[in-house]
Amino acid sequence: MKLFPMSSTKYYIFLFNFLLITSTTLSKSNFQPKTLFLLVKKDPSTLQYITQIHQRTPLVPLKLALNLGGESLWVDCQKGHKSSTYKPARCESAQCDLAWSTSCGNCYENNTSLPICNSCYNVVSNPVTSTTGEIADDVLTIQSINGSIPGPVAIVPNFIFSCPTTSNLTQNLGKNVKGMVGFGQQSPVSFATQFASIFKFSRQFAICLSSSTKRNGVIFIGHSPYFISLAFDASRDLIYTPIITQQRFVTITYPHYISVIRPSPEYYIQVTSVRINGKTLPLNKTLLSLDENEEGGTRISTNVPYTELEPSIYDIVSKAFINEMPKEVKKVPSVQPFKTCFDSTYIGVSRLGYDAPEINIVFQKQSVYWTIIGSNSLVKVKEGVICLAFVERKEATGQAIVVGGYQMQDNLIEFDLSRRRIGFSNSLFYRQTMCANHNYA
């Protein structure tokens, strides 16, 4: 089996081709937005973060789950899909290359205009499984921002996405959710990268996930400022750590059966240590480093509701957290999926959440760290019981730390792909605001 790495030169050639493909969009727009936005809300049943776009002709509203490490947008086209502007990507076209095609439809009939004939496919996935998807493009609309208020709607006539070849890929998503919107790094057709290429703004986006299942948070795509309230730009408080880029092996079946090395769309960062109430924990440093097989290290994921820790790391964090809890707060039996739980009768509560030990996630040096406070470290599971909102990793292999959605709630997190860095704001509660306090509804 042959191995072919994707060079950075080829990657940027793909981006250049993409600019040519989307040039018609600019001629049809009367404005050049600098920032776009999506509203996003936590689904109470799946704990996934759900947003909505409008796609197709005529336009149809589609609920989609947020996938930080996803390569692209995918939408279920199996049930009731109708669009006069849907265009499948033809084999060996620029769209196929951009969307990292892994195979191409074979023609067994004379009619080569059939969508399933001469169309290319890639891999699409949900948090549990994956399948193949037909690469295509169609009309998509998204709201722009004018300062701290909504601006005009941006219309993209040929946004690249994928249609899974089976309808069961939505089974692990929330009710009426029709797909996933991928914001993965290094992917030429990720949601943010396509808009940056089309409207010629910086490749960056920021998420502000609300802790409420009834009120929306917001996803910003494009330039800051990121106004969470009328007078507060949350991007001013960011501390940055580099994004780690990684490669992975992918099997391609067309035009030849080969294995290629492609960039991973996942977001990896280097965590050097963890402190609880200022005390550095004795973690295995080897586990904190990402290896060539994407094992170890730290990944950021919205597909994980609560931060997952490798078992030995979980034990150390849990014991240290228990030791630093107020003495009057007693342990109680575990409540799945959590192992470390407490009686909440005597724990204090402030605007920062529960009176819990402060957790510092330390990045490239001791002075650069992200602080997790009580509102993000403890979760109420039932009346009178709260639990440490971290879980032990079940799989034998994987990341040492996977930062989950609960820990990101009411924090602004910026993904600056142009500068290869991620910015963390710390809890917006310090600023007496929260992610639901925006003015974009």
Regions found by a protein language model. Give the residues of each.
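Aspartic protease catalytic domain
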Residues: 2-12, 17-29, 41-47, 55-59, ...
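Signature of the N-terminal lobe/flap region of pepsin-like aspartyl proteases
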Residues: 44-159, 163-176
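Generic detection of short hydrophobic beta-strand segments and adjacent strand-loop junctions
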Residues: 31-42, 102, 114, 123, ...
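Short Pro/Gly-enriched beta-strand edge/turn motifs at strand-loop
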Residues: 32-37, 115-125, 189, 253-256, ...
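Glycine-rich flap/beta-hairpin and adjacent strands of clan AA aspartyl proteases
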Residues: 125-135, 139-266, 361, 369-428
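Cytochrome P450 catalytic domain signature, combining two hallmark sequence patches
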Residues: 81-105, 195-197, 203, 232-241, ...
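N-terminal leader/early-domain signal
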Residues: 10-21, 25-37, 82-91, 99
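Short acidic, Gly/Pro-enriched loop/turn segments at secondary-structure junctions
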Residues: 148-150, 282-285
